């Protein structure tokens, strides 16, 4: 994938427009989780050091187009970045038509781009106005790279130069390394509640990986496809035939989808529900499967330890409740200890990484949700595609 890289450009005195992903949770005017801001600072700091005139925008929440509301304002983000830089960072509210100055080595935050008319529909008129503000457009929001919007795609068409920021470059390099040039065996762990939401990912991965580990509610559909009773567990009966065909497809290429041999069950979904260990073929009609058992867990740990590359998206049990979190905890520990190149992404996965404190032991953690999945599906991301075009 050849794109122009920000780090290769001379930015002195240039007007630089950065599209970051600063969509962070805010409570009572304060940022409650700043991981995305931290991830975006490398690009911002690089541009400031080079003496550029730096403008950064992002979406936050789901504002109504054309309507400014306090809860969708980037002001808390501007406050957070001001604190990091030790200087007051201005927030510019009405910026689309310009009319504001930025000094060399100064950073301004441009208010939530999703408030702008034409942003989500990627209107040419809006995109051209964005492009008029800058000499260099920097796409750094991998989290929205799968959406063609005016600030992620349209502006890249019309800006004098369109390049990939430091974070976007890192994300693309890590994903490419994991999926296009993987060290083998390549293992993917896909958890989550429904097969239907991850079906295209599962279909795409069955063509690439050596072992496809399914977890969470998804695993129940595969357990049933393998002939087991899953009781009252979350299970998509209508997708059992598809689960069967994916298992067959993997077998034909001497690859496997390991099926749990023991499980941890409860009668209801509750924090104080006692955990009961059962063989996978002994689940009763009123049981609900909430985790994998120790034998299955050990099998997965062995797979991870022998892997060359591990891609992790989604927990294997209800890890929010500790009694149903043993499987996910053991997998997290194995991912932290394996010599494999490890790549993790998705909200629940990051929550598990934080809970089990292995953040600095994963080779690469993707900040993106949907874009991460679409990359796993083998889809072209529109925001990356336009950067590739502009690099020609």
From Swiss-Prot:
Q: Where does substrate bind?
A: 21-23, 36, 59-62, 114, 147
Q: Which reaction does it catalyse?
A: (2R)-3-phosphoglycerate + ATP = (2R)-3-phospho-glyceroyl phosphate + ADP
Q: Which InterPro entries match?
A: Phosphoglycerate_kinase, Phosphoglycerate_kinase_CS, Phosphoglycerate_kinase_N, Phosphoglycerate_kinase_sf
User: Which residues take part in binding ATP?
Assistant: 198, 320, 346-349
Q: Which PANTHER family match?
A: PHOSPHOGLYCERATE KINASE, PHOSPHOGLYCERATE KINASE 1, CHLOROPLASTIC-RELATED
Q: Which family does it belong to?
A: Belongs to the phosphoglycerate kinase family.
Q: What is this protein called?
A: Phosphoglycerate kinase
What organism does the UniProt record list as the source?
Answer: Nitrosomonas eutropha (strain DSM 101675 / C91 / Nm57)
């Amino acid at each position: 994938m050849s794109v122009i890289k920000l780090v290769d450009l001379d930015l002195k005195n240039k007007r630089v427009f950065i599209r970051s992903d600063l969509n962070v949770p805010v409570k009572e005017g304060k940022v409650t989780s700043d991981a995305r801001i931290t991830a975006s600072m490398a690009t911002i700091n690089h541009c400031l050091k080079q003496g550029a005139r730096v403008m950064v925008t992002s979406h936050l929440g789901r504002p109504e187009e054309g309507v400014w509301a306090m809860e969708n304002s980037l002001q808390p983000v501007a406050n957070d970045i001001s604190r990091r830089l030790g200087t007051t960072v201005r927030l510019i509210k009405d910026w689309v038509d310009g009319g504001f100055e930025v000094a060399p080595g100064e950073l301004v935050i441009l208010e939530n781009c999703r408030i702008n008319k034409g942003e989500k529909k990627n209107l040419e008129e809006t995109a051209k106005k964005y492009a008029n503000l800058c000499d260099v457009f920097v796409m750094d929001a991998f989290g929205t790279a799968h959406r063609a919007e005016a600030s992620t795609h349209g502006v890249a068409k019309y800006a004098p130069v369109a390049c990939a920021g430091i974070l976007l470059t890192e994300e693309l390099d890590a994903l490419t390394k994991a999926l296009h040039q993987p060290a083998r065996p390549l293992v993917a762990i896909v958890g989550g509640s429904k097969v239907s939401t991850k079906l295209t990912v599962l279909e795409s991965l069955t063509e690439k990986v050596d072992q496809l580990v399914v977890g969470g509610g998804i695993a129940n559909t595969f357990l049933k496809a393998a002939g087991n009773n899953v009781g009252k567990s979350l299970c998509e009966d209508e997708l059992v035939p598809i689960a069967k065909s994916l298992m067959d497809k993997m077998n034909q290429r001497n690859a496997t989808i390991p099926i749990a041999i023991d499980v941890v069950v409860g009668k209801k979904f509750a924090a104080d529900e006692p955990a009961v260990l059962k063989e996978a073929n002994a689940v009763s009609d009123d049981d609900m499967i909430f985790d994998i058992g120790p034998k299955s867990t050990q099998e997965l740990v062995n797979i991870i330890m022998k892997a060359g590359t591990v891609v992790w998206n989604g927990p294997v049990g209800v890890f929010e409740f500790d009694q149903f979190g043993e499987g996910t905890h053991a997998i997290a520990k194995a991912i932290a200890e394996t010599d494999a190149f490890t790549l993790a992404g998705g909200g629940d996965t990051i929550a598990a990484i934080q809970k089990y404190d292995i953040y600095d032991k994963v080779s690469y953690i993707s900040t993106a949700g949907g874009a991460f999945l679409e990359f796993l599906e083998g889809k072209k991301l529109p925001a990356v595609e336009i950067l590739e075009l502009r690099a020609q």
